A protein has these predicted regions:
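Ribokinase/PfkB-type carbohydrate-kinase core domain
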Residues: 1-20, 34-136
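Flexible glycine/proline-rich, aromatic-decorated loop/lid segments
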Residues: 21-25
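Divalent-cation-assisted or electrostatically stabilized phosphate/pyrophosphate-binding catalytic cores
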Residues: 27-34
């Protein structure tokens, strides 16, 4: 069984640190950086989870901008999240989809986080179905 994941890939970034003082500019902690962790989110996380189950899987690359969700954790407490949301062009993605041969795949998993990749989902599904793939 071969699976393709198509959707909004998000980058999840975690900034970990500690604090021993408050900023003089505003009543917020000054975070001393300890560690930064970056991982895939959105459709990328769906891909990673299926891959961990030994599924023969690929991630559809759209060359579209990716949203980045940065979370700041200080002394074990979630302080804030900074979103750098990128919107993809659904029509550009549809053109890319229509230039792709989906016949090697048994399943195509659509993962929509409302970032634009699947704005044309109806047409994407219609095209993929012509290859006999099951769309989830």
């Amino acid at each position: 069984m071969k699976v393709l994941v198509l959707g909004d890939v998000i980058i999840d970034k975690y900034i970990y640190g500690t604090s021993t003082r408050i900023s003089p500019e505003a009543p917020v902690p000054i975070v001393n950086l300890d560690n930064i962790k970056t991982s895939l989110g959105g459709a990328g996380l769906v891909y990673e989870n299926l891959k961990s189950l030994d599924v023969d899987i690929e991630l559809f690359e759209t060359n579209q901008p990716r949203s980045i969700k940065t979370r700041v954790i200080c002394d074990g407490h979630y302080i804030t999240r900074i979103d750098d949301d990128a919107q993809s062009s659904g029509t550009d993605v549809l053109d890319l989809v229509k230039s792709t041969d989906f016949s090697p795949y048994d399943y195509v998993v659509l993962s929509d986080y409302n970032k634009g990749v699947l704005d044309e989902a109806k047409d994407i599904i219609k095209y993929i179905n012509t290859f006999g793939c099951k769309v989830i």
